[in-house]
Regions:
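Transmembrane alpha-helices of multi-pass small-molecule transport proteins
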Residues: 13, 40-87, 166-169, 189-204
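Transmembrane alpha-helical segments that form core, pore/gating elements
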Residues: 33, 149-209, 296-302
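C-terminal transmembrane-helix exit sites in multi-pass transporters
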Residues: 92-94, 112-133, 205, 252-271
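Hydrophobic transmembrane alpha-helices of multi-pass small-molecule transport proteins
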Residues: 130-146, 269-288
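Membrane-interface helix-cap regions at the ends of transmembrane helices
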Residues: 4-6, 54-74, 138-152, 194-213, ...
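Hydrophobic/small/kink-forming positions within alpha-helical transmembrane segments
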Residues: 22-27, 51, 58, 82-90, ...
Length: 302
């Protein structure tokens, strides 16, 4: 085999970091589902995700930009972004009360297709007929997973779709400010403002957590921050269009984690629908790569 060139080495490192992040992030859902089974309100898990996420990213932000980086440059804009991220996180965590992790994630994967469909309206981007066809195929994949008319559409399916839509709107807002500041700084601002919103929302339903639940709250923040850090580092080594399809490898660990911790396993039709979604997303990524389009480096996982 030919020796590894520096550029090829960077690409392989970026791919490895992205795959590592996708192997780690499903455990965020495992912890959230476990907290729900312990009877804690969903909003408390959302609050922990935001509050501990802000706390754990704080040292990185201080290292990147010092104390000046703690103040958002566009606070109202970041506040709306935080609101969409909270809506996505809340809807997804709530969907885990009704669905296995892999099923909820499969429906949630409609998010990049929604971004593509709405980008002409929100961002004025051009989407050609081939990418529209890929979006339509992805929507068909979502219908295969949900199968309306062939099975009862559970509240969890609706919540997972709402999570995908909310995160799509969050990502569209992220694209508008992409490149203005470091991704970690932007993420910190979103988590900080999100923690403020979540604090107000969780106050009326707050239940005193037990010590083990405080530990799970911290674990939510550690997993989310660790996964995000790996993704940021991956984007430092590879272009976005190469890494974007790798996000779908998260389904592998989500399936394993759901089976191991909760005894859940998706049915065959779910895998068929996920296959259609992945094919659609990979095609869209290839088209964007050929067009020279970059997806935003800022990334969030509900």
């Amino acid at each position: 085999m030919p020796p590894t060139t520096p550029e090829r080495g960077r690409t392989l490192t970026g791919v490895a970091l992205m795959l590592g992040a996708m192997a780690l992030l499903p455990f965020l859902d495992v912890v959230a589902k476990h907290l729900g089974q312990r009877g804690l309100p969903v909003m408390q898990a959302v609050w922990a995700r935001m509050a501990f996420g802000a706390l754990l990213t704080l040292p990185f932000v201080l290292r990147i930009g010092g104390a000046a980086a703690l103040v958002p440059d566009r606070p109202v804009y970041h506040l709306f972004r935080a609101g969409f991220l909270i809506a996505a996180t809340f809807s997804f965590f709530w969907s885990l009360k009704y669905l296995p992790i892999a099923d909820a994630l499969a429906i949630f994967f409609v998010q990049p297709l929604i971004v593509t469909a709405l980008s002409p309206l929100v961002l004025g981007e051009h989407v050609g007929p081939r990418r529209w066809a890929a979006v339509a195929a992805g929507f068909l994949g979502t219908l295969v997973i949900i199968r309306p008319g062939f099975q009862t559409v559970s509240p969890g399916m609706v919540l997972a779709l709402m999570a995908g839509l909310s995160l799509a709107l969050y990502m569209l807002m992220t694209r508008r400010i992409s490149g203005r500041s470091h991704a970690m700084v932007t993420t910190f601002h979103t988590s900080l403002l999100g923690a403020g919103i979540a604090t107000l929302a969780v106050w009326p339903v707050w239940q005193a957590p037990e010590p083990v639940e405080w530990g799970l709250f911290l674990l939510l923040g550690v997993i989310a921050t660790g996964g995000h850090f790996l993704i940021v580092r991956a984007y430092d080594h590879c272009e976005a269009s190469l890494l974007a399809p790798l996000a779908y490898t998260e389904m592998v660990m989500a399936t394993v984690a759901g089976w191991w911790f909760f005894g859940d396993f998706p049915d065959g039709w779910t895998f068929v629908g996920v296959g259609i979604l992945i094919a659609s997303a990979v095609y869209i990524s290839i088209r964007e790569r050929k067009a020279g389009a970059e997806t935003p480096r800022d990334f969030e996982q509900p």
